[in-house]
Every structure is written in structure tokens, then in C-alpha cells.
Amino acid sequence: MARIAGVNIPTNKRVLIALQYIHGIGQKHAADIVEKVKIPLDRRVNQLSDQEVLQIREVIDRDYMVEGDLRRETGMNIKRLMDLGCYRGLRHRRGLPVRGQRTHTNARTRKGPAKAIAGKKK
């Protein structure tokens, strides 16, 4: 099992699919990485040589922000918005949708389970 960017990627899958197990690498970035390293698209992870795995690691370390660094950066961006007190920061702080969705109905994923209000009848 190859270990890239601190993640054990599955060995039987194609390289293009296996790279997507790394947080921060989706279809587009995985295709770009495979193209840069010049690995055939049908190659599986267990068929990679140590040199190819090393090249993949180098490309990811040099060109992409992945895993812990990406999570930390995202968290810091949200914290910065909350500290500024801007509208988006307030929405994050209150646990409400940030991007303008309606909240009168729906938004249950963001708001959590419905809370019963005592004495409220229709």
C-alpha cells in the first residue's frame, strides 16, 4: 500500500482514482498529476515503481496544498471571517447557511435537528 501525503492509498485501484483519496485532490488535480509524471491512465497503484511514487509525492508536495495544511487553511479562513464580524462570519458563528439560502423552511443540515417549542400549536 503506497503512502502519499500521509494517506494510505488503495493498491488495486487505478492511480487516477486512488489519488482522489487524498483530501484536496479531486478528478482534475489527479489527472494533472498523472499527466505531469507521465503515468499511463490504466496503470494501477500496485504496478507503480518506487521512482514513480516518489515523483508523485514530489509533485503533490511542490504544487498542491493537501490534507492537514488544507484543513488548517480552511479553518483559519473561517476563523478570520468570524473575527472580522462580517456577515459571512456571523452566519458561520450562528451555524446558519452562509451563501444566501432560505432558512424559514429547510436548512436542517446546517441548523441541526428541529427543536420543539413548548406551547406552540397551529
Curated annotation (Swiss-Prot):
Gene3D superfamilies: 1.10.8.50, 30s ribosomal protein s13, domain 2 (4.10.910.10). Residues 99-122 are annotated as: Disordered. One of its GO terms (cellular component) is cytosol. One of its GO terms (biological process) is translation. Keywords: Ribonucleoprotein, Ribosomal protein, RNA-binding, rRNA-binding, tRNA-binding. InterPro entries: Rbsml_uS13_C, Ribosomal_uS13, Ribosomal_uS13-like_H2TH, Ribosomal_uS13_bac-type, Ribosomal_uS13_CS. It holds the Pfam family Ribosomal_S13. One of its GO terms (molecular function) is tRNA binding. Part of the 30S ribosomal subunit. Forms a loose heterodimer with protein S19. Forms two bridges to the 50S subunit in the 70S ribosome. Belongs to the universal ribosomal protein uS13 family. HAMAP family: Ribosomal_uS13. Located at the top of the head of the 30S subunit, it contacts several helices of the 16S rRNA. In the 70S ribosome it contacts the 23S rRNA (bridge B1a) and protein L5 of the 50S subunit (bridge B1b), connecting the 2 subunits; these bridges are implicated in subunit movement. Contacts the tRNAs in the A and P-sites. This is Small ribosomal subunit protein uS13. It comes from Rhodopseudomonas palustris (strain BisA53).
